Regions:
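N-terminal binding-site loop/beta-alpha segment at the start of enzyme catalytic domains
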Residues: 1-69, 186, 280-283
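Alpha-helical scaffolding within the catalytic cores
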Residues: 1-4, 53, 57-60, 89-91, ...
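CE4/NodB-like, metal-dependent polysaccharide N-deacetylase domain
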Residues: 7, 85-105, 122-126
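Acidic-and-aromatic substrate-binding clefts and catalytic sites of carbohydrate-active enzymes
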Residues: 22-26, 44-54, 78-83, 109-114, ...
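Short, acidic/polar
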Residues: 23-35, 81-96, 115, 140-143, ...
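A structural motif
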Residues: 40, 98-101, 129, 153
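A short, structured active-site edge motif that brings together acidic residues
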Residues: 66-79, 102-109, 136-139
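Beta/alpha (TIM)-barrel catalytic core signal, keyed to glycine-rich beta->alpha loops juxtaposed to Asp/Glu
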Residues: 108-283
Length: 283
């Protein structure tokens, strides 16, 4: 698996496996085991996904050495402050049955992110986290976080797909040494992604699926991607993107699909902020 070096000096796989919406315990455990068997080493979960215990169980069952894995989890909103971040992190670590996590992210850009960040800086210094980062932060919020803290985020996990390409945010992150990571690279199939004529034509040229074309496009932009599936054959397909390269013309054709609009929602929509901040979970 190819990796990218984060600003902490550690290596992060460029292709990862996410477990968002895997609420069935047995299915989640089996999916993580299958993903590791297929070659994935980056496993991405979150306290809010309510499946950290299942991820931890699966990791133990695989027998893969801990230093070969890259495990990410995330701080949910209700504890986005100094004391809350410290406490929720320990609960996540216990559920994952690990001594440390490779990457810990603030899941949403709300609450006392500065207090939570200072707690995360201390956890990193204590060796419990190898790298700290954020999710869904626009560049202005990142600039604010960087200005008033010591550690520059290692990763910003944001929505990136052919319809929302983050053409301004991605270069800004990269220019500050922050690694972009794509959630929902397939936009959950919205806008007819898997049947899109541009993507299907490019796929036919290389004998690849639309999913493989999208993941390769993200890969060539230097962005880490997270693909999710409970089917092992799809996991194997999604990771098999290193044996072809999109041409400059292919990249331009995909760039033309950008709408600069989320396939889901805006993190600056007041109604969405109210909904997210009101979502109290048992984490």
């Amino acid at each position: 698996m190819q990796t990218v070096k984060l600003n902490t000096g550690i290596e992060m796989p460029l292709l990862g496996f996410g477990v968002f919406q895997m609420t069935d315990a047995a299915e989640c455990e089996r999916a993580v085991i299958d993903a590791i068997d297929a070659g994935y080493r980056l496993i991405d979960t979150a306290a809010s996904y309510q499946n950290e215990t299942q991820v931890g169980n699966a990791l133990k069952q695989t027998g893969i050495a801990r230093n070969e894995l890259f495990v990410t989890t995330k701080l949910w909103l209700q504890d986005t402050h100094y004391e809350g971040a410290k406490a929720q992190f320990e609960r996540s670590l216990n559920r994952l049955q690990l001594d440390y996590v490779d990457l810990y992210l603030i899941h949403q850009p709300y609450g006392d992110v500065h207090g939570a960040w200072r707690a995360m800086e201390e956890l990193q210094q204590a060796g419990k986290i190898r790298a700290i980062g954020v999710c869904n932060f626009h560049p202005d919020r990142l600039a604010d976080l960087i200005a008033f803290n010591h550690v520059v985020p290692a990763v910003n996990q944001i929505e990136v797909n052919p319809f929302n390409q983050q053409l301004q945010a991605v270069p800004w992150n990269q220019s500050r040494g922050i690694q972009p990571e794509a959630w929902a690279p397939f936009a959950e199939g919205k806008n007819g992604l898997f049947q899109h004529p541009v993507l299907t034509a490019i796929g036919q040229k290389y004998g690849k699926s639309v999913g493989q074309v999208v993941l390769r496009w993200i890969f060539q932009r230097g962005i880490v991607s997270l693909a999710k599936s409970v089917r092992k054959e799809r996991m194997e397909e999604n990771i098999n993107i290193l044996d072809f390269e999109l041409s400059g013309e292919d990249m331009l054709q995909i760039a033309a699909l950008d709408t600069a609009t989320s396939a889901f929602f805006s993190h600056r929509d007041p109604a969405m902020v109210e909904w997210l901040t009101g979502r109290k979970l048992d984490v």
